[in-house]
Amino acid sequence: MSVILCTAGYDHTIRFWEALSGICSRTIQHPDSQVNRLCISPDKRFLAAAGHHTVKLYDIKSTNPNPLLTFEGHTGNITGVAFHCEGKWMVTSSEDGTVKIWETRSGQVQRSYNHGCPANDVVIHPNQGEIISCDRQGSVRVWDLAENNCSHQLIPEEDVSVSSVTVASDGSLLCAANNGGNVFVWQLLQAYDRTQLVPVTHFNAHKEYITRILLSPDVKKLATCSADHTARIWEVKDLEPAPDQEPKPFPLEATLTGHQRWVWDCAFSADSAYLVTACSDHYARLWELHSQQIIRQYNGHHRGAVCVALNDYSESAR
C-alpha cells in the first residue's frame, strides 16, 4: 500500500481511497463522534483519528475495524494531532486548552501543556525537540521539550484566533493563519540550541476565515484553505526581514475554485506537485497544482469532509 489517502468528517466514517481511481477501498465506522483530524504515522503503519474527546489509533494494514488503542485524557474536541518522526510519541491539541504528548505504544499521557484557552492546532518541529501550537486568543507558542517549558509566545494579532500552524520540513520557516484571513511568517534560526523567531512577512490571504495552513514538503509552496470556498497556493519567497518597510506578501500562484462550501483541510503529495482538499460539500478533491485542475473527486461521505491525510512517500525515500 504505497499511497495512503484517507478522509473523515461529520458522517462518523473514515474512508480510505485509491488515489488514482477514486474508489473507496475501505470504510471504518467512528460512532463516538465526528472526526476532526487524521494523521498517518511516518512508517505508514498507523492512522490516528482525532475526535471529540479521544484519539483512536488504527492499524492501516489490518482489516480489523476496531482501533488498536484509544487515547483518553482530553475533555474537549481534539483539534490537532502529529507523530514523532519515529512514531514513538504523538502530540495533540484540544479545545480543553491543553497540548498533550502521548506514548504511542501505551497510550499514556507523558506531558500536558496548558494554553489557558482552546488550542486549535499543533505541529512538531523537524528537530523533534520543540512543538508549536496555537490558540483561540491569538497566540502561537513554542514548547521546548528538553526544558519542558514554553520558550516563545507570539501574538500576531491580539484576540484574533490562530486557527492553524505549519513548520517547514527543513526547519527554516514557521507560518500561522488566523480567523481574520491573515498569514504570518517567521524565519526559524537555530542559535545555541535555542530557536529564534524572526518575523519575515504577513499578508491577507483570504477575506474569510483560514481553516488550514500548510507548507509543501519542498518548502516552495504554502497552501491556505478557507471558509471562502477556495484553497490558495502561495509561492514561498526568500524575503529578507525588512523592519522599515511594509512586508511583501508571498506571490499568489493559484486559487483552487470548484469547492461548493468551506474548505477545511489539505495535504500535499510527497513531490509537492499535487494537493488533496477536504470540503464541507462532502467531497475530497485531488488537484494538480501546475494546471490548477481537479484530477479526481472522492465521493462517498454523506456529510462534510473536514480532514484528510496523505502519505505517498516511497519506502526507499525514508
List each model region and its residues:
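Loop/turn segments within WD40 beta-propeller blades
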Residues: 1-2, 39-44, 82-87, 123-128, ...
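A structural motif specific to WD40 beta-propellers
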Residues: 23-26, 66-69, 110-111, 151-152, ...
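Conserved strand-to-loop turn within each blade of WD40 beta-propeller repeats
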Residues: 8-11, 49-52, 93-96, 134-137, ...
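WD40/WD-repeat beta-propeller blade N-cap
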Residues: 29-35, 71-78, 113-119, 155-162, ...
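Short loop/turn segments that connect beta-strands within beta-propeller blades
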Residues: 19-20, 60-63, 104-106, 145-148, ...
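WD40-repeat beta-propellers
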Residues: 14-17, 55-59, 99-102, 140-143, ...
